[in-house]
């Protein structure tokens, strides 16, 4: 089912927003912005009866234990204009395991009207165009803290053009890449925090209503039990205080993001920030002894090897250096460093980095590429041992709750490492090039329904040899026209081990010993050929070879399944909920603000 899409220039976006928010030359306070959009929506959107695709937000997917992104089909029963929401009735889901209430109150910006409508008399093209304007504004222009803006100041005059210009600069790579990636990360986190805040506050209000009703019933029907309830108040307090604590932490983080973004929103301050970063980098490079003259900073050199060691006993350090000696080419220059973060700040993309055992925290806003490598100073068998002590292994983790631990946009190699992804939403985002991983272990949090280990974007390829991927919602996600070669890879305790989102994704398991253990679903294949006799929309297969038989061009080999609830689940290409173009647009949209080089605004 095709959805409406719109390709517009940023000047068109600016004119559209100005047309909605023009107030005859008067001051437009932030508190009035939403009211103007409500009035515009009332004029343009059909009040009921139109079909659409609902892309379920991440916070709801997490709460309902659904994989993300999840999309469902249905129709709008009623538009709630005052809240810019709609009552959406679900009529079809992509996965039969998705269980949702039939009727849901959803935000209009989460809906994508379909081209094909049951009622041809409805003016759905105007409805779709209005939602597109609304979605662009509330996704890229309006910030969560704008509702607290002073009413005596003109919000449109101060922010509208500046923010659309910022979106344009980000999409056209006019900002220094570290700064651009940092700002995108801030924006993505702010949007997610706002969704989480809305969701938690709704839960708290519902809980308070329920508590009031219970107390009222207790006081009327059984007044003698009131003392008993008070006696257990300590236990109740511990339970109810958790959401309050979460709210406090989220509000605090939002305040930090706001203060930083309000500085970077100003073009002059952005330039000053970039110069400050550049000067700090030069000082760091000079202090590392790599260069003596500032002009040498711009000259490319041959790749070198960085050895990162944590404090330890002398004998331990000597043993690590002996191991490093066996891994470094004799003619290669070597730089000793204290932290991985410092190395990532000063190294070239083609440098080799060797890590000592221990925890290495990073907040890396650049990409890894150009045939560089990151390798742990340990034996390969130690990484994959079930009883391994992580404190004795080279572990890479995020310094805070970033959206993605590592972003790869070229050829790169990871070896003998533990990637601790328990505090990020995604372990590795592979944009293009070939990622080679040998003897690596990826750890998820084991509870999230949306966390991904490796995401392989269109045109990219990944080679995994002797790796362990465990405790993710999705171990490896293959997007269209991506490829993977897996050898002796173990998927353990994942909701979905390997995910193939379109029939053009190719996987080679030939000659390997891949295994799926204790996974809810071993392999998910979407839109693949199943033969003429297979007309069911969804099939569950016992072996990968049954799927490979009809897809010999892009699926090779076999694998083993142990204690999986379902081994291979296939969505027949004739039974897809969405057409390929629409499907891809909705799938890639969630990566638009997270470490992306080019934002495609639709």
Curated annotation (Swiss-Prot):
One of its GO terms (molecular function) is carbohydrate binding. It is found in: Midbody. SUPFAM superfamilies: Pectin lyase-like (SSF51126). One of its GO terms (biological process) is male meiosis cytokinesis. One of its GO terms (cellular component) is fusome. Interacts (via N-terminus) with both members of the centralspindlin complex, Pav and Tum. This is Protein nessun dorma. It comes from Drosophila melanogaster (Fruit fly). The lineage of its organism: Eukaryota, Metazoa, Ecdysozoa, Arthropoda, Hexapoda. The gene is nesd.
């Amino acid at each position: 089912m095709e959805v409406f899409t719109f390709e517009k220039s940023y000047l068109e976006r600016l004119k559209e927003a100005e047309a909605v928010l023009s107030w005859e030359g008067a001051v437009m306070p932030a508190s009035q912005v939403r009211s103007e959009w409500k009035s515009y929506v009332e004029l343009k959107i059909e009040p009921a009866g139109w079909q659409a695709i609902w892309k379920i937000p991440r916070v709801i997917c997490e709460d309902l234990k659904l994989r993300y992104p999840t999309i469902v089909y249905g129709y709008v029963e009623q538009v709630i204009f005052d809240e810019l929401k709609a009552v959406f009735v679900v009529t079809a889901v992509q996965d039969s395991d998705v269980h949702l209430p039939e009727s849901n109150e959803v935000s209009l910006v989460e809906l994508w009207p379909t081209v094909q409508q049951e009622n041809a008399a409805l003016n759905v093209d105007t409805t779709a165009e209005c939602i597109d304007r609304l979605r662009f504004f509330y996704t890229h222009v309006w910030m969560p803290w704008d509702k607290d803006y002073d009413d005596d100041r003109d919000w449109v005059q101060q922010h509208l053009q500046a923010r659309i210009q910022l979106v344009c600069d980000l999409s056209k790579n006019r900002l220094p890449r570290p700064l651009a990636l940092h700002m995108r990360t801030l924006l993505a986190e702010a949007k997610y925090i706002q969704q989480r805040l809305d969701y938690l506050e709704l839960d708290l209000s519902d809980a308070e209503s329920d508590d009031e009703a219970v107390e009222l019933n207790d006081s009327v029907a059984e007044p003698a039990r009131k003392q008993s309830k008070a006696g257990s108040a300590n236990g109740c307090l511990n339970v109810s205080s958790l959401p309050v604590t979460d709210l406090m932490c989220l509000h605090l983080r939002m305040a930090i993001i706001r203060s930083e973004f309000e500085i970077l929103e100003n073009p002059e301050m952005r330039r000053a920030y970039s110069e400050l970063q550049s000067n700090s980098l030069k000082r760091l490079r000079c202090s590392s002894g790599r260069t003596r003259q500032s002009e040498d900073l711009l000259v490319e050199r041959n790749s070198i090897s960085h050895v990162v060691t944590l404090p330890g006993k002398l004998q331990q350090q000597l043993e690590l250096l002996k191991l490093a000696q066996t891994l470094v080419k004799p003619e290669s220059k070597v730089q000793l460093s204290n932290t991985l973060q410092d190395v990532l700040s000063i190294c070239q993309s083609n440098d080799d980095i060797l890590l000592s055992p221990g925890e290495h925290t990073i907040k890396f806003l650049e990409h890894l590429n150009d045939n560089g490598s990151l390798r742990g100073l340990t034996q390969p068998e130690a990484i994959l041992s079930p009883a391994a002590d992580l404190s004795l292994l080279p572990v890479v983790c995020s310094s805070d709750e970033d959206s993605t631990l590592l972003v790869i946009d070229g050829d790169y190699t990871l070896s003998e490492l533990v990637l601790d992804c328990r505090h990020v939403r995604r372990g590795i985002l592979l944009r293009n090039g070939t990622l080679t991983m040998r003897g690596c272990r990826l750890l998820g949090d084991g509870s999230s329904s949306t966390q991904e280990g490796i995401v392989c974007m269109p045109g990219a390829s990944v080679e995994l040899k002797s790796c362990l991927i465990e405790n993710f919602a999705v171990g490896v996600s293959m997007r269209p026209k991506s490829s993977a070669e897996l050898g002796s890879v173990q998927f353990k305790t994942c909701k979905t081990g390997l995910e193939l989102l379109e029939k053009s994704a190719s996987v080679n398991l030939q000659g390997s010993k891949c295994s799926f253990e204790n996974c809810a679903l071993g392999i998910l294949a979407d839109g693949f050929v199943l033969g003429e006799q297979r007309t069911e929309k969804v099939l569950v297969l016992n072996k990968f070879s049954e799927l490979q038989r009809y897809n010999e061009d892009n699926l090779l080999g076999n694998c083993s399944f142990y204690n999986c609830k379902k081994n291979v689940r296939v969505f027949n290409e004739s039974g897809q909920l969405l057409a390929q173009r629409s499907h891809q647009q909705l799938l890639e949209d969630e990566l638009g603000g997270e470490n992306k080089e080019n934002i495609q605004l639709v």
